[in-house]
Amino acid sequence: MRFLNELHEGDRISGIYLCKQKQPAVTKNGKPYENIILQDKTGMMDGKIWDPNSLGIDDFDALDYIEVMGDVTSFAGAMQLNIKIGRAHV
């Protein structure tokens, strides 16, 4: 697992992180997505689940540890993670 402060745009990651916050949202086109904040001991990073109903996205809540796979991108000058798989980690 890589720490959040080590990530750079273009990185592909796989690891277990704390879901600090989870909030449903809607794009300008009316498509639902999940806006989450991931945290580890080095800091926090914004994350997006653009297709929350896709295979591999399990139901999880804020303050759950989740297994995450995705790509690091930059939007409006800030790093964010586009999450492809998010599974609750027990």
Descriptions of predicted regions:
Residues 1-13:
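OB-fold nucleic-acid-binding modules
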Residues 6-9, 34, 67:
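Glutamate identity and glutamate-enriched acidic tracts
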Residues 17:
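Non-catalytic, usually N-terminal nucleic-acid engagement modules in DNA/RNA processing proteins
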Residues 22-32, 43-89:
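OB-fold single-stranded nucleic acid-binding module
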Residues 35-40:
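Short, acidic/hydrophobic/Gly-rich beta-strand patch recurrent on exposed beta strands
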